[in-house]
Regions:
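Histidine- and acidic-residue-rich, metal-dependent catalytic cores
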Residues: 1-188
């Protein structure tokens, strides 16, 4: 929602875009169904070989949603979901995967979801880590400005910081929206 206020995105972001990204962003990690549980649920750091396998989830998810989109007759929800699944691990500086895209070559929904996903991971308990505070997570995101993240998406995140603090606090106690849906809805 915040990026509706950014002049250079007015031709791309409207209420329909916000609704579609809200609906399609939870598909970002759908490709993890193709990753062995011993890697997904590993309590410690992944080996380099395990990480290479884990990275395959982006292509698996994107391919799955591309096939579903083709079968369903090109629905914008699935097209956006496909772009997000493929590209949510791309980085602004071109050091991400699977396509090594950079800057505006990364689809906007994927750039927004990338930050939301990182915030969700940082502030959530995982098999390999305890949740970080909002402040620590914010610092990590700010440090990733113009390297990991689109600077405009970081600006949108910071403009809605008070709402992110609330998400962080309720992260483990709500069954309503997933944390990533809450984050994406506010940024987009």
């Amino acid at each position: 929602e915040e990026m509706l206020n950014f002049e250079n995105y007015r031709d791309v972001i409207d209420d329909n875009f916000v609704e579609e990204i809200y609906q399609s962003s939870p598909l970002h990690d759908i490709g993890t169904v193709g990753i062995p549980d011993m890697i997904l649920l590993k309590p410690g750091k992944l080996t380099s070989e395990e990480f290479e396998i884990m990275k395959m989830h982006s292509a698996i998810g994107g391919d799955t949603l591309r096939a579903a989109d083709k079968e369903a007759g090109q629905h914008s929800f699935l097209t956006m979901g496909r772009d997000i699944a493929y590209c949510h691990h791309e980085k602004w500086d071109g050091s991400g995967y699977p396509f090594v895209l950079k800057e505006r070559r990364i689809p906007l929904p994927a750039r927004i979801t990338a930050l939301a996903d990182v915030y969700d991971v940082l502030t959530s308990k995982r098999p390999y880590k305890e949740p970080f505070s909002h402040e620590k997570s914010k610092t990590i995101i700010e440090e990733g400005r113009s390297t990991h993240f689109d600077p405009d998406v970081v600006d949108a995140f910071l403009a809605r910081e008070n709402k992110f603090i609330l998400i962080c606090k309720s992260n483990q106690s709500t069954d309503e929206l997933s944390p990533i849906q809450q984050v994406v809805q506010m940024i987009g």
